[in-house]
Amino acid sequence: MTPDFGVAPFVFVVRDAFRAKLAAMKKIISTSEAPAAIGPYSQAARSGNLLFCSGQIPLDPKSGQIVTGDIGGQTRRVLDNIAAVLKAEALTFDNVVKTTIFLTDLGDFQTVNEIYGSYFKQAPPARSTVQVSALPKGANVEIEVIAVANGESSETTAYDTSG
């Protein structure tokens, strides 16, 4: 007669296999070329061909201090920080498919747009811009991005099927 262990051992085997698969699906990205995280989060996380970049504020990567000055300088610093995170995974702004911009003053929208456009020269990604009451360390702008690796986003053609 064989002992009856029930389903419990099977459940643990499946659970452990699932946890291992999840761990293999997520890669944490960190580069010294961008500011270190100022909280319990990563600069970016990659799952398959998707890269999720945490919001960047205008911190100098070397000093960790906020870049002072006008919204133009802050926006450039933020986008340069994002470029460094993308570069850590051999990606560029051409790989970005979605951005979210957080501004403390929508009066800065036009200036941010002009600078943003100089980084996204062709086929700009989908984007949301929202005004918030405050950002960490007194920043005036924060931007987060989602990027696709391996050129996946440019290999698909969309067709209008409405008519």
Language-model segment annotations:
Residues 9-24:
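Short, Lys/Arg-enriched N-terminal segments with co-localized hydrophobic residues
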Residues 25-163:
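Short, polar/acidic, helix-capping and beta-turn segments at strand->helix junctions
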